[in-house]
Curated annotation (Swiss-Prot):
UniProt-recorded name of the protein: NAD-dependent deacetylase sir2E
Keyword check for Zinc-finger: no
Record's catalysed reaction(s): N(6)-acetyl-L-lysyl-[protein] + NAD(+) + H2O = 2''-O-acetyl-ADP-D-ribose + nicotinamide + L-lysyl-[protein]
Superkingdom field: Eukaryota
Recorded phenotype for the gene knockout or disruption: Null cells could not be established, suggesting that sir2E might be essential.
Provenance organism: Dictyostelium discoideum
Gene: sir2E
This protein's record includes keyword ATP-binding: no
Annotated binding of Zn(2+), by residue: C160, C165, C200, C203
Domain Deacetylase sirtuin-type: 27-300
Length: 343
């Protein structure tokens, strides 16, 4: 049995040879990182995934930066503000939001193999996920809502900014059909939807998408769950970034904490990040590299199960992680006891 067992006994179809070549290329390029990370994932340590727009590109959703079609380059910084909305709600919706975010292809988007791998990691390992994406694809991939913080919001949900309204901070509006506000015979499916600004069901004032805008902060609405996110950051032992450009506040928080506490960080992206110290890179498209990591994890679990093959390794992984987690807790208790003994 060799370390390359991940690729043994594969049935190669002529129609997918090119895909398998890409997989093998990515695997060999990142082999040491896959092996190391898979072992760390089985160690019982707490893992936190932080996902960005790059994860959803394969699902047909434009990234925010670093591509020719990126939403970032399409005036998002100018228009993505509460100030712009207050100046002209109709223009905000029709000129900006419905052209860059709440579009039919975004609403119809499905999770790709990267999302599905993360969902499996959450199930196997009990990991948590903080996403910068508003596309709801982690939920579509069956990540439990209690294991997910959508720190930048979610499309098809809305908020009010009228002072004193319960939807200003405490609650989220989830019962509005945006197409009901269409004008001039336009529709979402035709890609030309124009609307009159939707109104708050409570105070009847124009409402905003439930999305963190550039002149807002994470504590501007409870939906963004910033306190929960910060707790997860403090508790985690290993941080795995996927498809992020490290250009927003939440990634800065994670990096500062990880570096100060000397915690391990891994980055899945199409390029190697060289400006952040202590960050190990797995280079390649996340819809390929994340399933490869899952295979490596299954292989490591099989090795620790004395090579016994099983139909599904989920329970084996959970058992190994649980056992190692208990060992870690026992070791920490011993260290705490030793440090508390007076000399």
């Amino acid at each position: 049995m060799t370390d390359d067992i991940v690729f043994e006994n594969m049935v190669i179809d002529d129609t997918i040879v090119e895909e398998e070549d890409v997989e093998m290329k990515y695997y060999l390029k990142n082999k040491k990182e896959f092996e190391f990370l898979a072992k760390e994932m089985l160690s019982g340590k707490k893992i936190l995934f932080i996902t960005g727009a790059g994860l959803s590109i394969n699902s047909g959703i434009s990234a925010y930066r670093n591509t020719k079609t990126s939403v970032w380059s399409n005036f998002i910084t100018e228009w993505g503000t509460r100030k712009k909305f207050e100046q002209d709600p109709a223009q905000f919706w029709n000129h900006f939001w419905l052209r860059t975010h709440e579009k039919q292809e975004y609403l119809d988007a499905l999770p790709n193999s990267g999302h599905l791998a993360i969902s499996n990691f959450v199930e196997y390992l009990g990991s948590n996920v903080i996403t910068q994406n508003v596309d709801a694809l982690h939920l579509k991939a069956k990540v439990p809502i209690e294991k997910l913080v959508e720190v930048h919001g979610r499309i098809s949900l809305y908020k009010c900014i009228t002072k004193g309204c319960r939807f200003e901070y405490d609650d989220t509006i989830d019962n509005i059909e945006i197409g009901d506000y269409s004008i001039n015979g336009t529709t979402m499916k035709q890609g030309n939807l124009e609307i009159t600004p939707p109104l708050c069901p409570e105070c009847k004032k124009p409402i905003l998408p439930q999305s963190l805008l550039f002149d807002e902060n994470y504590s501007s609405h409870q939906f963004y769950n910033i306190e929960k996110a910060m707790d997860w950051i403090q508790e985690a032992d290993i941080f795995i970034f996927i498809g992020t450009s490290f250009s927003v506040g939440i990634t800065e928080e994670v990096i500062c904490h990880a570096q100060s506490e000397r915690k391990k960080m891994f980055n899945f992206n199409i390029f190697k990040e060289t400006k952040i110290s202590g960050l190990k890179s797995i280079v390649g498209k996340s819809e390929i590299t994340l399933p490869l990591l899952e295979r490596q994890l299954l292989y490591e679990a099989q090795k620790r199960n004395n090579g016994k093959k099983q139909i599904w390794y989920g329970n084996t992984i959970k058992r190994i992680v649980s056992e190692n987690s208990m060992l870690l807790k026992e070791a920490m208790l011993k260290n705490d006891t030793k440090s508390s003994v007076k000399v």
